[in-house]
From Swiss-Prot:
The keyword Zinc appears for this protein: yes
Biased composition range(s): Polar residues: 1-31, 46-60, 137-168, 373-411, 1005-1015, 1054-1082, 1095-1106
Binding-site positions, Mg(2+) 3: D1610, E1652, D1685
Record localization: Cytoplasm; Nucleus
SUPFAM superfamilies reported in the protein's UniProt record: DNA/RNA polymerases, Ribonuclease H-like
Low complexity composition-biased segments: 960-969
Domain RNase H Ty1/copia-type residues, every copy: 1610-1752
Superkingdom in the source lineage: Eukaryota
Keywords linked to the UniProt accession: Aspartyl protease, ATP-binding, Cytoplasm, DNA integration, DNA recombination, DNA-binding, DNA-directed DNA polymerase, Endonuclease, Hydrolase, Magnesium, Metal-binding, Multifunctional enzyme, Nuclease, Nucleotide-binding, Nucleotidyltransferase, Nucleus, Protease, RNA-binding, RNA-directed DNA polymerase, Transferase, Transposable element, Transposition, Viral release from host cell, Virion maturation, Zinc, Zinc-finger
Protein name per UniProt: Transposon Ty1-MR1 Gag-Pol polyprotein
Record's catalysed reaction(s): DNA(n) + a 2'-deoxyribonucleoside 5'-triphosphate = DNA(n+1) + diphosphate; Endonucleolytic cleavage to 5'-phosphomonoester
Site (Cleavage): H401, N402, N582, N583, A1217, A1218
Record-annotated Reverse transcriptase Ty1/copia-type domain positions: 1338-1476
């Protein structure tokens, strides 16, 4: 480094040693405005660093360290005594007024002496303001006075820096605008440079060349104030001056930074694009340069990703480095670090090759001549710490233990180097220690110290003013190309590649950082004691340690050779992986692979694994010796630290100190468990536990929720309890970081009570082990107690409380005492404790009647907290009581599901006592449990509901046990108890295995069959399907409780005098077992047909022949015979072959008539006069009288493992109440939420399609100007009623496209925000079917259209606001709606009014009265369904004209123009239609069903024999009360909704033959018994098997140009609950079935005729409405017909005799029918029952009959 000699005018005071080696920042002439922006961030600290590190002496002044002090004391700044500045001066009032700055009010505010004006600066009129310099002052301004203690520069330097006194400095202009401040600063800096003050301005190194004096600072302040008036300063300048009005340097630094930041980005990008590297400069410097540019761009908001950065770097590689372009060209995941690693490897290899060549050229003797000393050409100067020792040192290197630096950098005081015992050093030159240079550049002399190098250590150098290091591995925050010139003792430049920080981690676990320079051209790594002293670290060579001023030892010092060293192990490595470049020659001729390179290449494996693999030759091409393992031990891979980061292990025993520090009940642990799902509202869902640290005493409290007030109540209770009961105050409560503990309410409560909350650390649950383990123990006890007792799940907290009582009384193995003993309480009296769930009899002290029993069976739970009684659960009353009036049942089973309490009491009065509590669940609770809570996209924190498939999988973990007992005979014991509540045993059936738990592909084909012998003797059994039928068995056994049904009476023979209603015999459910299902012949089957006895109101004419049509002539019209025949002529009625009369055998004639009044819900129309009634027999015809059932599904036990869990709360569901509670079929959600479609969607392809649809929807919303984008509203300013939540829904359309829709949450819309009177209309399905039928008959063209985003075309009138879509990131703002967003209550009505107005006014259409969304004119008919349009016209051009007009206003898409004469396929509102104009039309849903049914998770049977009918006749739905666990009940109801919802959609579209089965099962959605679910599965299986069936229409060929509209009616009398009949109607237009209806009668019918009248009366209004629609669409005459198979009904309709009206209800209906028949010209005709196709709408039919009635119109 450059030598600095002491001036002759500067005496050596204070015994300061001279500097032997220093570094000097050479002053440059570079304009400070041209420095890089990245190099100016420290410019702000220039003024704070001025003199901050320089010792203050009486001979040298310094700026106070706290320069931000508002009023520094003048006494702290000594004034010069004999210098050229004799007096202190402040700005006067006149000067202040001119500059605009306020006058200093106190001398202490301006303590610095005024900087007198230089004679070179003579502005006009300024002579009176500033005192001139004395004439004898001939040095420049930075030259201090001799008394200042500083040295004058030599004459040469003074001469070069002086400016002639004859020249005038041009003053800067006065600032006139804040916008011109930066330009003014440029001129002001030039002014300072011309005034010889340029060296105090920060340069490119971010530091000034020298420190300013007090006088210079005063001059700076005065000139700045004079030429920059305060009113024109920018705000940021005023902010700086408000803190310290003298900090002008900070203002100049920031100004320079701001000026350079404008052009720095362009320069960086240009530099990055024009990179060039060929190995001529060190790779470290190249990497530092590029890294610096990338970091700077990233900080300025211009991020450059790895791929682009690597392309820039590779483009600039040349020479030997060029091949890296090709080697890395195809690398996909390439990073800048990897690329620079390869560059470093190549550079190191080049340097190694050069050093090897140099070694061969030089002899070993020459190498020994390398020395750290050079020839002394100046007079040696002795610098000693001990003057008593002679100067006997020889010419050698300066030792690092007794020299210090003396330069502009701050140096240590003499006391920093303590007690050296070495001899004084004789330096032959001013600087005797060099920093090293490249050995190839020059030859140096060497002393006799040849072995003075210690690897892995830093050389301590007291003469070096800077720390230098050869490896960039330890440099932090490196920046390249520093403007620093460093020279050695021979004044040779040492190139510096980078500057950064060197970070130490010493023994006292402290970290320290100093500045470091990087250069590979030195022989040793030098550590400057001067820079260590600046951070309060000194070297004590008596102790050989580095220590702080307070004596703290930081690191040992090692003396090796003649030098002192410090180990590099205290250095912290940086994240720059750069190979160390050393210029010391190596004796190795081969290059080793660095371990970091091998570590990264071998997937970041550890060193031990890599070495073991190389030893065993599992990796070839190189050996273990080819790797440099020196850095493997202490190597830290940052990527491994990040990628393999793990949690620390919990420290065991960390809580032991608390046990000794706190008294009992002062330190508590608490935690919350929950929630427990599927519990009644009265049962708690959570519990909170407390544990005392010292005594381990536990408390538990129930919680229904985790709200703040609930938690606060518990804390208040527990604190009061401890304070009053134990006279203790809680000091600390340890808890986790749940929101229930970290909320502000609880925090304030604890703070108010002086309690310290102690929270667990993140991801360290074991730190909360006391509370966590307690909860786990209590839950284990809870599950065990519930399993042992068999009690329902809603009593779970009682089990928790029982366990807590016991656990507090058990001794701990460690303390040998129980928690109660530690707390000073007495032991638990076990005589007062009962086993949990112990059966007891509780005294009923308040019975309803004196004759009622006084004892109620119950179960003991736990001792009462509030009394001396016991808490007992009473199942019959469904409540718990606190009582002492109980008796323990000795020797009885303790399991709820094994103990028969009804058998114990033997008194039916108890059942009557508790009967009122067995009511069916309220309809509002059912509705609430079945609602699907769909949250908006903005409420992602809320719970996400399970997908139906996931829910089914979750619930499929439980299996109910199987009653595998063989059928038993009916004994007297089985008759004795008729109302016993039978519960399935809780034990796991041994027959259950994996094969019968998992869903089976086949169901058992053998149902439960009644006893054959008893059946043959006249006894009849009702089919009771067992709760579980193992799927591995071929036969199912009769349930053990089948004989206990209250409706069953066993008898050996049938009595003619029997008056009780008897159940209709049940046909078997099919099978192949010859022992249970004997084969029958057709002759025997025919004998089973029994004619029902005539009703009292049945006309005798019904016994007439059934093979001809009887025309009925009304009073108003007397059509001819051919009119009635023409009505029936074209109908798709079955063709019946003639049948000879069959006489019944004597045995059949002796059978009594079957009572038709059934109280059971049935799928068979047994009570109807037109039904086929069958009885059990040994032989039957499978084809005629029953439906084939090939699979016996166990509806909930096939996938349930619930029997392995504790018993749960159960619901008792009554059939009648469940049927009455069903109002409508709840639609099943078919759409996906945002999280389901995108966030958690694992199907990548589908996810991408949904994302594309999402962006498409957003663009459409913006295009349609759905909301006001000009203003966003604060949520707090808007009425919450007008704020509508929004969400995105996604679905996949039938054509395979994915669609997203932004919708409003209309389900939670406030009623005040819409008009409830507005209606959203869509086309009626009958209107669509009618239009299609007329189109076929008239050869119409059918065109299908779609209007995109239809609702958004309708304006919204109300003031509504929504939250913006999620992608806008504005969750706290609101936007006002301008258009009718999908989902709003009024959107549909708004769109309907908009499109209706347009079609009428612009397209010339008229809406058909009474039929909304049906528009017509003379040429075109339009059916509108929201945004879908179907156009019908004779001429295709008419459709095109309508389309052109629609496109003028709406975004109209043509789905199918329909211009082809061949078969055209449509998808209209879910119907798959095949249409060939003028020939036929086929309507089906095969593709849709193929896609949807498998998603229902119904176990289909694709390989077995297909079902031939959707149901089986004569099968009753059991009325017995259904008892289910609550979660099972909800799951089954939800499953029924899905299945019936799909079946209903299909049935009302075109499968009218299934409507009876769908309607009947829909009534039992809330009664999901095993039998009902089996029937539902059968229906879905039948739909699957017949999914290819279609509704077939052929073009009619009428004789006359008329339309014929016919309704066929039928009723099944009394086959529904409450004697309700089933009615059905089928509507036909020109012989084509266009609709059907099957429903339960709204009134109770007392006869078949009443049922038929009711059915006809329900069909006539729709018949008249359809007639009007047909006449409007097709201007032709119309003939209307009404067909029924009830002659008595026809006679009542056409008769004028009112005596037939037996009651007012049906009399009114009959009279209305008479009027309608006569007034509307209805032709009422009779049709044979066997040809009545409406028969399929009212009852289940045998296979043969079902096929016969449906195969002509659906196949």
């Amino acid at each position: 480094m450059e030598s600095q000699q002491l001036s002759q005018h500067s005496p050596i005071s204070h015994g300061s040693a001279c500097a032997s080696v220093t570094s000097k920042e050479v002053q440059t002439t570079q304009d400070p405005l041209d420095i890089s922006a990245s190099k100016t961030e420290e410019c702000e600290k220039v003024s704070t660093q001025a003199n901050s590190q320089q010792p203050t002496t009486p001979l040298s002044s310094a700026v106070p360290e706290n320069h931000h002090h508002a009023s520094p004391q003048a006494a702290q700044v000594p004034l010069p005594q004999n210098g050229p500045y004799p007096q202190q001066r402040m700005m006067n009032t006149q000067q202040a007024n001119i500059s605009g700055w306020p006058v200093y009010g106190h001398p202490s505010l301006m303590p610095y002496p005024p900087y007198q004006m230089s004679p070179m600066y003579a502005p006009p009129g300024a002579q009176s303001q500033f005192t001139q310099y004395p004439q004898y002052v001939g040095t420049h301004l930075n030259t201090p006075s001799p008394e200042s203690g500083n040295s004058f520069p030599d004459s040469s330097s003074a001469k070069s820096n002086m400016t002639s006194t004859n020249q005038h400095v041009r003053p800067p202009p006065i600032l006139t605008s804040p916008n011109d401040f930066l330009n003014w600063v440029k001129i002001y800096i030039k002014f300072l440079q011309n005034s010889n003050l340029g060296d105090i301005i920060p340069t490119a190194t971010r530091k000034a060349v020298r420190q300013m004096t007090d006088d210079e600072l005063t001059f700076l302040c005065h000139t700045f104030q004079l030429f920059a008036p305060s009113q024109f300063l920018p705000p940021w300048v005023k902010d700086i001056l408000s803190v310290d009005y003298t900090d002008i340097m900070k203002i100049l630094s920031k100004s320079i930074n701001k000026m350079q930041s404008d052009t720095q980005e362009v320069n960086d990008i240009t530099t990055l694009a024009t990179l060039h590297y060929n190995g001529s400069t060190p790779a470290d410097a190249f990497e530092a340069e590029v890294t610096n540019i990338l970091d700077r761009l990233n900080n300025n908001g211009i991020p450059i990703n790895n791929k682009v950065a690597c392309q820039f770097i590779m483009r600039g590689l040349s020479g030997e480095y060029k091949f890296l372009r090709y080697a890395r060209h195809r690398c996909i995941h390439m990073t800048v670090a990897d690329l620079f690693s390869d560059i470093h490897s190549m550079y190191e290899e080049q340097q190694e090759s050069k050093r090897n060549k140099s070694t061969h050229r030089r002899s070993p003797s020459d190498e020994k001549k390398d020395s750290r000393t050079y020839t002394n050409t100046t007079k040696p100067k002795s610098i000693t710490r001990n003057s008593q020792k002679p100067n006997n040192s020889q010419s050698r290197t300066a030792r690092a233990h007794n020299v210090s630096t003396f330069n502009n950098s701050p140096g240590p005081d003499n006391d920093l180097i303590r007690g050296s015992t070495t001899e004084p050093i004789q330096l032959k030159n001013t600087h005797d220690l060099h920093l090293g240079q490249e050995l190839t550049e020059s030859t140096v002399n060497h002393t006799n110290h040849s072995d003075d190098k210690l690897p892995g250590h830093l050389l301590l150098d007291s003469g070096a003013s800077r720390t230098l290091i050869r490896s960039a591995h330890h440099i932090h925050s490196a920046s390249s190309n520093p403007d620093i010139n460093v020279v050695d003792a021979q004044k040779r430049n040492i190139p510096i590649n980078a500057i950064g920080d060197l970070q130490f981690h010493f023994q006292d676990n402290t970290k320290t950082s100093i500045k470091v320079l990087h250069t590979p051209n030195i022989a040793y790594d030098l550590l400057s004691l001067n820079e260590l002293a600046a951070v309060d670290i000194t070297a004590c060579f008596t102790k050989n340690v580095l220590e702080r001023s307070d004596g703290t030892v930081l690191a040992p010092i090692v003396k090796y050779g003649d030098f002192y060293w410090v180990s590099k192990k205290y250095l912290l490595p940086s994240n720059i992986s750069v190979p160390t470049i050393n210029n010391v020659h190596t004796s190795e001729s081969t290059r080793k692979y660095p371990y970091p390179f091998i570590h990264r290449m071998l997937a970041h494996a550890n060193a031990q694994t890599i070495r073991y693999s190389l030893k065993n030759n599992t990796i070839t091409y190189f050996n273990e010796s080819d790797v440099d393992w020196s850095s493997a031990i202490d190597y830290q891979c940052p990527d491994c630290l990040i990628g393999k980061s793990t949690k620390h292990r919990h420290i065991k025993g960390s809580r032991l100190k608390y046990q000794n520090s706190y008294e009992p009940f002062q330190y508590l642990h608490t935690d919350i468990f929950g929630p427990v799902h599927n519990l009644p509202k009265s049962a708690p869902s959570y519990f909170i536990s407390f544990t005392d640290e010292t005594t381990k005493f536990r408390w538990v409290y129930p919680l229904h929720d985790r709200r703040e007030d609930s938690i606060l109540d518990v804390f208040t209770t527990i604190l009061a309890f401890i304070k009053n009961q134990f006279q203790a105050s809680v000091l600390v409560i340890q808890m986790d970081r749940g929101s229930e503990y970290t909320n502000r309410t609880l925090h304030k409560f604890l703070e108010k009570n002086g309690i310290t909350p102690c929270y667990t650390t993140t991801a360290d649950s074991r730190a909360h082990g006391v509370a966590e383990r307690l909860n786990r123990t209590l839950l284990d006890d809870c599950r065990t107690q519930l399993q042992c007792s068999g009690l329902p799940n809603h009593l779970w907290f009682s089990a928790i409380e029982f366990s807590t009582i016991v656990r507090n009384s058990l001794a701990s193995p460690k303390s040998k005492k129980s928690a109660r003993q530690h707390a000073g309480l007495a032991g638990l009296d076990i005589s007062t404790l009962l086993p949990f769930g112990q059966p007891v009899i509780v005294n009923d002290h308040n019975p309803n009647s004196k004759i009622h029993p006084r004892g109620i069976p119950g179960y003991a739970l736990h001792p009462s907290r509030n009394s001396y009684g016991y808490i007992i659960y009473l199942p019959s009353l469904k409540k718990t009581v606190d009582t002492t009036n109980y008796v323990i049942l000795q020797g009885k089973e303790s399991r709820l599901d094994q103990f028969n309490y009804d058998a114990l009491t033997f008194d039916e009065d108890l059942n009557r006592l508790t009967a009122s509590y067995h009511s069916f669940i309220a309809s509002n609770e059912i509705q609430q449990s079945n609602d699907l809570n769909i949250e908006s996209d903005h409420d992602f924190q809320s719970d996400i509901e399970l997908h139906p498939e996931q829910l089914r999988n979750v619930l499929s973990k439980a299996v109910s046990p199987t009653d595998s007992t063989p059928p038993s005979t009916h004994t007297e014991d089985s008759k004795r108890v008729s109302k016993t509540n039978i519960r399935a045993p809780r034990e796991v059936d041994p027959n259950i295995s994996e094969s019968n738990i998992l869903p089976s592909k086949k169901r058992s084909s053998t149902p439960q069959i009644s006893d054959i012998e008893s059946t043959g003797s006249g006894g009849m059994h009702r089919l009771d399907v067992p709760l579980l039928a193992p799927m591995s068995q071929s036969n199912t056994h009769e349930s053990s409780h089948a004989s206990k049904s209250k409706d069953f009476r066993h008898s050996d023979s049938y009595s003619d005098n029997e008056t009780n209603h008897t159940n209709v015999p049940i046909s078997s459910t099919g099978g192949t077992n010859n022992k249970t299902v004997p084969q029958t012949s057709e002759q025997e089957t025919e004998k089973r047909i029994i004619h029902r006895s005539p009703s009292i109101d049945t006309s005798s004419s019904e016994s007439n022949s059934l093979h001809h049509v009887v025309p009925i002539k009304t009073s108003d019209t007397c059509p001819k015979e051919n009119t009635e025949e023409s009505i029936i002529a074209d109908l798709p009625l079955p063709d019946l072959p003639p049948e000879p009369p069959t006489e019944l055998s004597d045995s059949f004639k002796e059978l009594p008539p079957i009572n038709s009044r059934q109280t059971n819900s049935s799928l068979g129309g047994i009570g109807d006069s037109n039904a086929y009634t069958t009885i059990n027999s040994k032989k039957r015809s499978l084809e005629d009288n029953e439906t084939e059932i090939k699979v016996s599904r166990d509806t909930w036990n096939t996938k349930n493992m619930r029997s392995l869990e504790p018993p749960r709360s159960k619901k008792r569901i009554h059939l009648i109440a469940a049927v009455k509670a069903v109002k409508s079929i709840k639609p099943i959600r078919t759409t996906l939420r945002y999280d389901e479609a995108i966030t958690y969607n694992k199907d990548i392809k589908e996810k991408e399609k949904y994302i594309e649809a999402y962006h498409k929807e957003v663009n459409q919303l913006l295009k349609m100007k759905t909301w006001d984008t000009d203003k966003y509203y604060d949520r707090k300013e808007i009425d919450p009623k007008r704020v509508i939540n929004s969400m995105f829904i996604f679905n996949r359309k039938r054509d395979g496209t994915h669609k997203a829709r932004f919708v409003a949450r209309g389900d939670i819309q406030h009623p005040d925000t819409y008009d409830s009177g507005m209606q959203s209309n869509t086309v009626h399905h009958y209107a669509l079917m009618t239009s299609l039928s007329l189109a076929l008959d008239n050869n119409y063209y059918i065109t299908q259209l779609d209007i995109s985003s239809a609702y958004l075309y309708a304006d919204i009138k109300e003031e509504l606001y929504i939250r913006p879509p999620p992608h806008l990131g504005m969750n706290d703002k609101l936007i006002r709606l301008k258009k009718s967003l999908y989902g709003l209550k009024q959107s549909g009505a708004n769109w309907y009014e908009t499109i209706k107005s347009y079609l009428i006014k612009q397209c010339g259409m008229e809406e058909v009265r009474g039929w909304s969304c049906v528009f017509e004119n003379s040429q075109v008919t339009i059916c509108l369904f929201v945004d879908d349009m179907v156009l019908f016209s004779k001429n295709l051009n008419s459709n095109k004209r309508i389309i052109d007009k629609l496109k003028m206003q709406y975004d109209t898409k043509i789905i199918n123009l329909g211009e082809s004469d061949e078969e055209i396929q449509y998808d209209i509102l879910g119907l798959e239609i095949k249409y060939q104009r003028g020939k036929y039309m086929k309507l089906g849903m095969e593709n849709s069903l193929t896609e949807k049914i498998p998603k229902l998770n119904v176990p289909l049977n694709p390989k077995g024999r297909k079902l031939s009918a959707p149901g089986q006749p004569g099968l009753y739905i059991d009325q017995q009360e259904l008892e289910l666990e609550e979660d099972d009940y909800k799951m089954k109801v939800h499953e029924m909704q899905k299945l019936i919802g799909l079946a209903s959609y299909v049935g009302y579209k075109f499968r009218f033959d299934l409507l009876y089965y769908i309607n009947t099962l829909a009534q039992h959605i809330l009664f999901p018994s095993k039998q009902v679910l089996d029937m539902t599965y059968e229906l879905i299986q039948f739909i699957w098997n017949t999914r290819d069936k279609q509704l077939i229409w052929h073009k009619s060929k009428p004789v006359k140009p008329t339309n014929k509209l016919v309704v066929i009616s039928d009723a099944s009398y009394g086959n529904q609950p409450y004697y309700k009949s089933q009615i059905g109607n089928i509507y036909l237009l020109n012989g084509k079935v266009i609709g059907g209806k099957s429903t339960k009668a709204s009134l109770t019918c007392t006869s078949t005729t009443e049922a038929e009248i009711h059915a006809i009366s329900e069909s006539v209004p729709l018949l008249n409405n359809l007639s009007y629609l047909i006449q409007e669409l097709d201007k032709k005459p119309i003939t209307k017909g009404l067909l029924t198979d009830s002659k008595s009904t026809i006679s009542i309709i056409i008769s004028n005799n009112e005596e037939k009206f037996r009651n007012r209800f049906f009399g009114t209906k009959a009279m209305r029918l008479r009027d309608e028949v006569s007034g509307n010209h209805l032709h009422v005709c009779y049709i044979e029952t066997k040809k009545n196709i409406a028969d399929v709408m009212t009852k289940p039919l045998p296979i043969k009959t079902f096929k016969l009635l449906t195969n002509k119109w659906i196949h």
